[in-house]
Every structure is written in C-alpha cells, then in structure tokens.
C-alpha cells in the first residue's frame, strides 16, 4: 500500500529476518573471538614455557634443552606446526639419552612471540643463532630440520659454518628440485586464504579442535599410538588454539617462493656429515632420486634413507632417526 492512504509501507518480512540472521552471526562471531582471547590469556598464565624465553631483537623466543650428551643437536620445525617442542617430544626422548637436544621455536611458533620477522631462511637462521647463544647452548651443532626448516638449516650452515657439526634432514624441503620451479606464490591453497585463515583469526580454531577427537591428528598426525602422552596431546591441542596460522606462519608460507630462491644454490660443505630421511610419499610426489642425491652429496659421511612414513617422519621413525644420527656422528664427527 502506498502513502496516499496515510499509512507507511510495511517492511518486507525477509528483510527483517535477514537482519536478525546478520545480528545473530555478528554476536556469535564476536562472542567466539572474545572467549578465545580470554581462554588463551588464562591458558598462557597456567601453562608457562617449559624452556627458556630468551631475548632476540627485543622479542622472546622459546629454547628448550634436554639431555647432557657431548653431541649438541638442534631441532627446527616444519611449516605451521603450532607446538614444535611438543611435536618433537618422542624424538627428543630418544636423542636425549645420548645427546644434548635443543628445540628452538621460531617466532610465531609454540611459546615464542609473534613478530614482524620476514621469516626468510637467512633471517630465521640468524634469530636461531642468537637464541642458542642467549640460552647458553654450546656448539658446534648438529642441525636437525623438519620440512621447511631444511632451508633454515642450509642458511645456518652457510652463515655459521664453524658452528655446525652435522645436518640431519627430516623429510626436508629440497630447494633445487624442479617441483619448486613454478613455486612463486604462497605455500597454502586458496581455500586456506579465503576460508580457513579468516576462521582461525576469528577464534574458531577452538571449535575445530573440539571435534578432532582424543588425538589432535586431524592436521599433523600426532597420536598416542606413536608414543605421545595424553598430557602432551592435550597441550598440543591447546597451543594449536593459540598459534595455529600465526602472522609469522602466514608470512613464512607467503614468501615460500622467495625462500626457495634464497637457498636454491646452497650446498652443504663437503666435509660436513649429512643424513637425510625422506618419506617415500614425498619422493614420489615431489623429488627425483637424482635431486635427493644431489642434496645429500656423496661420500661415506653422506647418507640418504627413504622411509615408509608420513611427511612427519619423526612421529613414527624416532628410534631409527636417533640410532642413525648417533652412528653418523660416532663415525664422522669432525
């Protein structure tokens, strides 16, 4: 009805309903975010870092050392692992029986601060080097890098060659592989950019992890069946809520192409002991045997092992990795 009869037009019912739906969604989204911030603050207060929080360029980086052996091993995590110190626990347990083992959580990982770091290999290597010295961890170091930390390890060995005693790759990223020739964009797919990342930023990671079951294996495969305790898995879930896809992780994924270019021409010193564990599924999908052989290098102190495991080789092959590393360093320590 028009205004000639003296009555105002009635609002359409669908507009009212749409307005109610939008209002409910806004309140729900805001409530989830507020709850996430409050719970994270409480959890951080109740669960302090198990290791040292050392100063690196005005920010705190988490460094956790276990064991007292003569060999000093430094563990570095793969891309987007929210809780590296906890993720490496079964491997640390094996290695610390004969070595001094240090897990360094880069910025934006675990208990370390979120910063504006470039997250390129040379900058991460510099920060790791600073953190190790600040924590009083003595070298030379056997660098043990998972996945993208293979790039960090290459940069570290290139920048601080006198402080590196060996390298063990855990299904590492091989930058000179043809697989990366066209990798100029981010490491994550568009679904992540358009859907998953906004959900995480809005605090919905807690909703997702609430449905992941007793083991937080929906993304990273950590399981009680592989030697993780219930307490460890609960803490992994908690830190996933805190740190999943932090600004640093987002940046590290975004600059993958630049990181590949920065390390493509690097090779380990010919005298450096090198041991590389490659998951069979990774080899089949991304690398040729020749590319792996070039990465590892030749010689009695250069060893390559293909394992029937997931990309997270240390979840199931921790005993084998520990034994192989010990044998390598016993024979080839320089």
Predicted regions and their residues:
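Active-site loop/oxyanion-hole signature of alpha/beta-hydrolase fold enzymes
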Residues: 66, 106-144
């Amino acid at each position: 009805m028009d205004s000639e009869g003296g009555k105002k037009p009635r609002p359409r019912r669908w507009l009212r309903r749409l307005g109610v739906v939008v209002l409910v969604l806004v309140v729900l989204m805001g409530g989830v975010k507020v709850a996430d911030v409050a719970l994270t603050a409480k959890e951080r207060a109740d669960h302090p870092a198990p290791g040292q929080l050392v100063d690196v360029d005005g920010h705190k980086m988490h460094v956790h050392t276990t064991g007292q052996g003569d060999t000093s091993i430094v563990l570095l995590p793969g891309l987007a692992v929210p809780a590296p110190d906890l993720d490496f626990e079964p491997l640390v347990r094996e290695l610390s029986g004969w070595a001094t083992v240090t897990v360094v959580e880069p910025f934006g990982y675990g208990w370390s601060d979120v910063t504006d770091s470039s997250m390129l290999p040379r900058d991460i290597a510099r920060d790791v080097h600073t953190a190790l010295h600040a924590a009083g961890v003595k070298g030379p170091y056997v660098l043990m890098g998972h996945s993208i930390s293979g790039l960090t390890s290459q940069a570290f060995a290139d920048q601080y060659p006198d402080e590196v005693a060996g390298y063990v790759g855990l299904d590492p990223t091989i930058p000179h592989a043809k697989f990366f020739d066209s990798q100029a964009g981010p490491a994550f797919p568009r679904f992540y950019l358009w859907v998953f990342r906004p959900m995480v930023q809005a605090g919905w990671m807690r909703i997702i992890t609430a449905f992941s079951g007793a083991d937080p294996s929906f993304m990273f495969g950590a399981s009680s069946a592989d030697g993780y305790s219930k307490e460890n898995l609960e803490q992994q879930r908690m830190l996933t809520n805190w740190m999943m896809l932090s600004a640093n992780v987002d940046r590290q994924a975004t600059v993958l192409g630049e990181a590949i270019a920065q390390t493509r021409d690097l090779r380990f010193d010919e005298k450096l002991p090198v041991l590389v564990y490659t998951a069979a599924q990774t080899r089949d999908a991304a690398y040729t045997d020749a590319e792996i052989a070039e990465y590892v290098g030749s010689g009695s102190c250069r060893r390559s092992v293909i394992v029937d495991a997931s990309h997270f080789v240390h979840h199931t092959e921790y005993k084998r990795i520990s034994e192989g590393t010990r044998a390598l360093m016993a024979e080839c320590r320089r």
